[in-house]
Amino acid sequence: MLVTTTERIPGQEYEVLGECFGVTTQSRDIISNFGAGLKNLVGGEIKGYTKMLTTSRQEAIDRLKEEAAAMGADAVVMMRFDSGSIASDMQSVVAYGTAVKFIEKIRVRPLT
């Protein structure tokens, strides 16, 4: 399934099926929380959180593709992410976009 952040797919006509979403919520583990507390003191990347967000984004895209496929879509255009914290130890990531179905182009032979 093609997923793109652009509005158009060059050379492809399609009909819009509607909006589609992929959502995931992940909790931070105790070790990541402890490591984050230490990093707050000395600064630097919190690799446990980075890994969690990377995994969450991929899971959200996978779920977006599943929903689009269930709608009969061939692709998703204008894909975007949104994310936010829930309480102090959970992260929610949403991938959303527009599900589209390709329209077959009819090739007309020139008259001779």
UniProtKB/Swiss-Prot annotation:
Protein family per UniProt: Belongs to the UPF0145 family.
InterPro entries per the UniProt record, alphabetical: UPF0145_dom_sf, UPF0145_YbjQ-like
Source organism superkingdom: Bacteria
Name of the protein described by the UniProt record: UPF0145 protein LAF_1635
Species per Swiss-Prot/TrEMBL record: Limosilactobacillus fermentum (strain NBRC 3956 / LMG 18251) (Lactobacillus fermentum)
